[in-house]
Curated annotation (Swiss-Prot):
It comes from the Bacteria. Its EC number is 2.1.1.190. The gene is rlmD. Catalyzes the formation of 5-methyl-uridine at position 1939 (m5U1939) in 23S rRNA. The keyword Iron-sulfur applies. This is 23S rRNA (uracil(1939)-C(5))-methyltransferase RlmD.
Amino acid sequence: MSDPTEFSPPPPTSTDLPPGWLEVTAMDMDAQGVARKPDGKVVFIDGALPTELVSANTHRKKNNWEQASLTEVHRQSSQRVQPGCPHFGLHAGACGGCKMQHLHVAAQVAVKQRVLEDNLWHLGKVKAETILRPIEGPAWGYRYRARLSVRYVPKKDKVLVGFHERKSRYIADMETCKILPPHVDAMLMPLRALIGSMAARDTCPQIELACGDTVTALVLRHLEPLSPEDKDKLRAFAAVHGVQWWLQPKGPETVHLLDEGGEPLAYGLPDFGITMPFKPTDFTQVNPHINRVLVTRALRLLDARKDERVIDWFCGLGNFTLPIATQAREVLGIEGSEALVARSRENYQSNQAQRQDGSALAATSFVARNLFEMTPEMLIADGASDKWLVDPPREGAFALSKALADIHQARIGAEDAPPLPAGHEGWQPPRRIVYVSCNPATLARDAGLLVHQAGYRCVAAGVVNMFPHTAHVESMAVFERG
């Protein structure tokens, strides 16, 4: 929920509006239209778009803001479009997976760009010197990863499979989902029928979807052991729909194939000749089309050279690490999970062995470390590097940015700076940092540290429309030593 202490909409351009009418002047990071009442109170309006004149029904009031739902549009935005999905909207039971289908895709990107710039300035007091061209891709059928909730409803004797309703714990009664790949969208109703036919229909709370370039995997979470008959039904479904079934009886570590064999899950990064095998519960980007462009753009901005050492922080399976290894002299991938580090090494070794153009990947090593507890001592222990790629989760890279800032503050003799660690004399900070973010607020916080305390400039920033029709803002920023 947005807060007017953090977000202040532009003033309305219309005056003397009829009673109850509101002029929407902005959209917040939750995809709500924002207006002001004549008394100055901010109103967040579900379903309203900038430039529209609307009426709305208030359902929550605070001292200086209200939350409301759109009831009527008196002047429509030129960017309003017909939603592509019948389950999108403000009606009872509407799906909560998307928030912006009523807004033209190009305008969605513009809203996300403004959200990024507003966060950088208001939270970090940072303004990028250059705005990068947005990274865009298909608006529909892009979501190759999804966690679908499952529920058997005894009163209706049917199974629901899909996302939750808007602002609700209930599962939407979905027959279709246009952001899923077409072949998965076509499976929704058959999946409902399959689960409904199983003895375990009321003990299967979730199906996780993971699509590779050629393989589609479905992970069935089941709270009780499956009967042989239920397993046979899964096999029959797999044969008809061309999917792999994985089973999850308990935690993520228990995930296993229903039947061994078959082609492994993998996605390619063809610009670098890299193939990335993965398991269905691994973190991979939701949108493979955008991921390919994102990796190429990030590496172009990083501009690693054959005489340079690069560190990839929060490296995961090596989505950026391995492409960097096609360009740099040496690469170090750092990740918080020992299991992911082991998998990264395997991916590196398999790609090294399968290089078809005769080139070799750079010397690359992987280490596990708690990246949320980084210190200046740990930075220096990892050795000097020319450039960094940083791709943290939503929590951001505060400890990493703070450690870099602490070293800089100590070197310039700032008051209250921590002492310099032993061995710092030969250590130099990276000349360039490319930061890929899935949360503009934590990016802005970290950018503030890098720019105001660590001696960097924010030379470029821009959005990546990884999740069309949602309010999620993916972005990237480039920092260079001042």
